[in-house]
């Protein structure tokens, strides 16, 4: 099949997971469209080159703030259309939970979109302090999470400062503290209750919903809260009903089921006399990381408009059936707002090609296991391929055991491997996925016979969910996509940890154990993009092997082009050492003592001292200059 732009899109499933923000251009480069297909197209290799010319180094995080605004606009437009279709007059507010990515360049950009259609959510005291500064006057702030008196006091101060803060009661003990602090400050609090739904959305994050959820009130506890408030000056303060169906909900039916249950809570609270003006449905809107449009954990089987409709319709029907005032619908879809806006770019530093295998010459003292392997290779065209592979596996294992017992030497051990790889490649050429009986062996061979692409980044720092929960992220070369990839490889990071390997890849609308990649060219960079990393990854990343934050740039649309709006240097080695308790002055003193004790010339001492200082203040990652 002739390689083409369409085939590049299909191979990496780009058109499905990209959601209109990324594609391949005629030059074989990945391009980003920050404001959608009708806007400017920006070449990712061109941006990386411009950032490097300005001093940035790889690995490099590219942020596209215009995507944040565009995603928010699409979310608001979807709910506007759904409310129009269902004749729902309650309105809609998209709340951003800043735990998804607290960076000022993310939360601040979203917060700059003024109006009733946007709000912020905090789940801790530091996050609350941030949103109190970011929110517009009169802006909606949802206060979730565990709370002590200081947290509650700060939220109430927000009310006195003209912000619409709502303290969501998630534990029965919180209500008493809220009422006491409100009385002390002389302010009427904005109150909400988080109800714990029995409905459970399937997926990796299902424990955030359902009866076993960490947060939320049981039906009895909800009634107890209302019993305390009813008939007091605070009764009219209970305005928010909040719930959470789960995060990254893959199946739209789970959303529909959760909304049916939640709507009953809204109706019952309203009939009891609570003035519920806002229904906060929490998160749940998923991202199709896989591009498979399915119910698997890292995909979704619905679109944005379907999501909005499944939220609006039950509330619209309930308000009509029970003659209730439609509440304002609030969502906390942080993942959907932010995932697309960030791309990590890293360079391949080296490739370890899978051995092709060979048939060694016959020697007089050849062990029986080597002779058997040689005979198997000679029968590749005469016997069933699968049968030969299983025999080769048997004798290969027998040879390894013999070597461990000292019965064969290293030379013959290497010959066994050579023959096994030669047989494996020969068997794979004779198998086809069209034959159902071939698939198990073919899958095993495809997983075994792959190159290792060593990439200048840390899985644990930049895409920690790959290690923690087997999260899928699309990975695509950002250039040479006008050439057919001729190798299959796995991506390995820089860390001294076998978990620093990506094990699943998006390919041809499914998942595979390896990724189609190109052969490296001497003296030419080969750069790979890790896409949809804008949600959670920066915040969850750790410092395994003391690899810290990468360099980052913000790339803003400027007319029909772009500009690098902001550049942030990543962590240097001295910053990482200081973070884990090293006294840098002492480190430098020890270096100086050892140089003096070595008895070198002044010139050599100066040169070594300069190199040590450069290492101490340098970027922890490898050089991004391609090897000659």
Swiss-Prot record:
* E.C. designation(s): 4.1.1.19
**Highest taxon, organism lineage:** Bacteria
Q: Which cofactor does it need?
A: Mg(2+); pyridoxal 5'-phosphate
Q: Name one Pfam family in it.
A: Arg_decarb_HB
Write down the InterPro entries for this protein, in alphabetical order. Answer: Ala_racemase/Decarboxylase_C, Arg_decarb_HB, Arg_decarbox_C, Arg_decrbxlase, De-COase2_CS, De-COase2_N, Orn/DAP/Arg_de-COase, PLP-binding_barrel
Q: Where is the signal peptide?
A: none
Q: Which UniProt keywords apply?
A: Decarboxylase, Lyase, Magnesium, Metal-binding, Polyamine biosynthesis, Pyridoxal phosphate, Spermidine biosynthesis
- Does the keyword Metal-binding belong to this entry? yes
At what positions is N6-(pyridoxal phosphate)lysine found? 99
The reaction(s) this protein catalyses = L-arginine + H(+) = agmatine + CO2
Q: What does this protein do?
A: Catalyzes the biosynthesis of agmatine from arginine.
- Name by which UniProt lists this protein: Biosynthetic arginine decarboxylase
What are its GO biological-process terms?
arginine catabolic process; putrescine biosynthetic process from arginine; spermidine biosynthetic process
Question: Binding of substrate: at which residues?
Answer: 279-289
The family annotation for this protein states: Belongs to the Orn/Lys/Arg decarboxylase class-II family. SpeA subfamily.
Q: What class of enzyme is it?
A: lyase
Q: Which GO terms describe its molecular function?
A: arginine decarboxylase activity; metal ion binding
Asked whether the keyword Magnesium is assigned, the reply is: yes
